[in-house]
Design a protein with these regions (language model features):
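Conserved N-terminal helical subregion
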Residues: 3-4, 76-174, 182-187
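N-terminal Rossmann-like FAD-binding beta1-loop-alpha1 element of flavoenzymes
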Residues: 7-33
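Conserved Rossmann-like nucleotide-cofactor binding loop
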Residues: 16, 39, 168
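Glycine-rich FAD pyrophosphate-binding loop
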Residues: 25-48
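N-terminal FAD cofactor-binding segment of flavoenzymes
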Residues: 47-84
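Conserved FAD-binding catalytic core of PHBH/FMO-like flavoproteins
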Residues: 63, 145, 160-265, 270
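FAD/FMN-dependent oxidoreductases across multiple families
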Residues: 235-321, 325-326
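C-terminal helical "tail/cap" subdomain of flavin- and related membrane-associated enzymes
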Residues: 313-391
Length: 391
């Protein structure tokens, strides 16, 4: 097939691209989603995906508005109500949903569960066309339209193309959009474990000079551990069998973790990227295609959902006023709404990373003093929590 017309072509149908496609379709846009492969089917008695996202209250509201949250809950997710962080035992900061008069802070959700819930909704929507397997090989702009050439010869002509294709975005590269980027001197290991005790509804993170150690409670007696460390150390951990990894967990995680049995693990390097622009005429970037962040506070996908909410709002409003909704002036409104917010969150995580990634005694004293002050900050602490939750 050639020259297939659509209003909006979205490259990438994952957690962010899928949500954006569904939201735009629900507002009457015709949407074509180009994705390499369908998400894996959900298997109820399977062990959890090692890739876990902490979905904030604001992101849950977005997913409820899209009509997919019930499907997520019908598969599996786990609420969390408290978030605790510390380095010294005398310097804890506790964020509690009750401080904001909320029932919970958010949910721990496997990435595959979110992807499957969104995919099912996309398959059922009459305004959505799925091109899967689909692989973008070229992108050209002709006469105020974007022309997407796919592997196999199909050409899609769209009024707007959106790159939701991840950190190594082809759309961003083909559009010639540069990035400001650097590699952190840390990698991250995600470990799926079974707990001897109920994991509860609190997530916690202990800072160490080598990197944080974090605990994310999941369904039943499952949990996810997050181990940040030097790339060399993470490679050592990757080469261990599960019994050896279990011994390392017991040595290097706080005693409150209790006895856990690791059953799966995966690792990835940590890179900060920020696109120099989010938009061009008839083109926009969302999610990791536009920005990646240190996963310290679990904000990656939540920032992507803020992008989704803002871009839908901009496009729907522009169309309602009869504007050329795919034009550069309109798309710049989206960039203005999101670029600064994403930069602030990235910079905040960079400060935490820099402040907690060394073992100088004076700095250790200052940062723990800062944690103690944060715990007693009252209104400022609540405002920081509201900002992180997108409220």
């Amino acid at each position: 097939m050639t020259n297939q017309p659509t209003e909006i072509a979205i490259v990438g149908g994952g957690m962010v691209g899928g949500a954006l496609a569904l939201g735009l379709a629900q507002h009457g846009f015709s949407v074509t989603v180009i994705e390499h492969a369908e998400p894996a089917p959900f298997v109820a008695d399977s062990q959890p995906d090692v890739r876990i996202s902490a979905i904030s209250a604001a992101s849950v509201s977005l997913l409820k508005g899209l009509g997919v949250w019930d499907a997520v809950q019908a598969m599996r997710c786990h609420p969390y109500r408290r978030l605790e962080t510390w380095e010294w035992e005398t310097a804890h900061v506790m964020f509690d949903a009750a401080e904001l008069k909320l029932p919970l802070l958010g949910y721990m959700v496997e990435n595959t569960v979110l992807q499957q819930a969104l995919w099912q909704a996309l398959e059922a929507h009459p305004k959505v066309t799925l091109r899967v397997p689909g692989s973008l090989i070229a992108l050209h702009r002709h006469d105020d339209l974007q022309e997407l050439e796919l592997k196999g010869g199909e050409v899609i002509r769209a009024k707007l193309v959106i790159g939701a294709d991840g950190a190594n975005s082809q759309v961003r590269q083909m559009a010639g959009i540069g990035v400001h980027a650097w590699q952190y001197a840390q990698s991250c290991m995600l470990i799926s474990v079974q707990c001897e005790n109920d994991p509860g509804d609190s997530t916690w993170q202990q800072f160490t000079p080598d990197g944080p150690r974090a605990f994310l409670p999941l369904f039943d007696n499952w949990a996810s551990l997050v181990w940040y460390d030097s790339p060399v150390r993470i490679r050592q951990l990757q080469n261990m069998n599960m019994a050896q990894l279990q011994a390392e967990i017991a040595k290097h995680f706080p005693s409150r973790l209790g006895y856990v049995t690791p059953l799966a693990a995966g690792a990835f390097p940590l890179t900060r990227r920020h696109a120099l622009q989010y938009v061009q005429p008839e083109l926009a970037l969302v999610g990791d295609a536009a920005h990646t962040i240190h996963p310290l506070a679990g904000q990656g996908v939540n920032l992507g959902y803020r992008d989704v909410d803002a871009l839908i709002d901009v496009l729907v409003n522009a169309r309602s006023y009869g504007e050329a909704w795919a034009s550069y002036p309109v798309l710049k409104r989206y960039q203005m709404r999101r670029m600064a917010d994403n930069f602030i969150m990235q910079s905040g995580m960079d400060l935490f990373y820099a402040g907690f990634s060394n073992n100088l005694p004076p700095l250790r004293f200052v940062r723990n003093l800062g944690l103690m002050a944060a715990e007693r900050a009252g209104v400022l602490k609540r405002q920081a929590l509201k900002y992180a939750l997108g409220l």
